[in-house]
Each structure stands twice: as C-alpha cells, then as structure tokens.
Amino acid sequence: MAKQSGIKWLWLSLVVITLDLFSKYLVVERFELYESINILPIFNLTYARNYGAAFSFLADHSGWQKYLFLTLAIIISFILANVLRRNQIDQKRENMAYALIIGGAIGNAIDRAYRGYVVDFFDFYWHIYHYPVFNIADVAIVMGAGLLILETFLDKKKKSD
C-alpha cells in the first residue's frame, strides 16, 4: 500500500487562513484606524495597516510592492504545497511547518489583494519601544519557520546518533 502524502496537512493552512481573516474582519469592523485597546501592560490590540512586507518593509513605495508580495506569496505557497505533496504524511514537524507558512502567506495575500494592504493588530511594547504590529498570519509564518529550524537541528542530532 502506498504511503499517504503530506498534502493532507493543508487542513492546518485552512485553519490559519480562517482564523487570520476572521480576526482581521473583527478588527476592521470594531476599531478605527490606529485605535488601541490595552490588554496587558506590554500588549495592546491596535488597528494598523501595512502596505509593505514584514516590519513595513517597502511600505512607502508607490504600490508596485503589492503585486510583488502577492506574486511571492503565490509562488512560495505553490512550491511548499508541492513539497507537502512529495512528503510522507508522518513527517509531522516539517509538514506542519510548511502548512503554517502556506496558511500565513495566503492569509496575508488575500488581505493584500482585497484591501490593498494587510491588517495588523498585535502590538507588543516595552515603555515607549514598540515591536512592529503584526497579525495571526505573521505568527503562523514565524512558527512555521521556527519549526523548520528546529527540524534541522533535530535531524542533524538524529543523523549524528
């Protein structure tokens, strides 16, 4: 019997996309732009718009970056979906990582295509120093990248044993 493909992990991408888009919908519907609600002494929910990439990279350009980031998200998602298709279903950490990255990339791409920008709202700070505002899709991408790094170290350790 043939082994099952890792493509079945795309369910996780759908969960990320759903949570991401729903959270952004709630923020846009209930907050004014730049409105902030303090949740903890180091954390606010703040409605911000990001016209660029991570940390608002290229946000101050004339609009071409929207198409660049959309194209990159689509290409990366297709490449990673192909990797999932080739992986075995039991490669859990690696498949989970790719699915998280795909979900985050598509969540932000949908936002960018629909609105022309990405809605961000998680605002962590210490005194007057604010970390760049981000969203659930960004968290998924970072978690996926972190899992890939972890998998690399664990794989090296396993091979050396």
From Swiss-Prot:
Pathway(s) it belongs to = Protein modification; lipoprotein biosynthesis (signal peptide cleavage)
The record describes its membrane topology as: Multi-pass membrane protein
Which sites are catalytic? D120, D138
Q: Which InterPro entries match?
A: Peptidase_A8
Catalytic activity entry? Release of signal peptides from bacterial membrane prolipoproteins. Hydrolyzes -Xaa-Yaa-Zaa-|-(S,diacylglyceryl)Cys-, in which Xaa is hydrophobic (preferably Leu), and Yaa (Ala or Ser) and Zaa (Gly or Ala) have small, neutral side chains
Task: Quote the EC number.
Answer: 3.4.23.36
GO MF assignments: aspartic-type endopeptidase activity
User: What NCBIfam families does this protein map onto?
Assistant: lspA (TIGR00077)
Q: Which family is this protein grouped under?
A: Belongs to the peptidase A8 family.
Q: What is this protein called?
A: Lipoprotein signal peptidase
Gene name as annotated: lspA
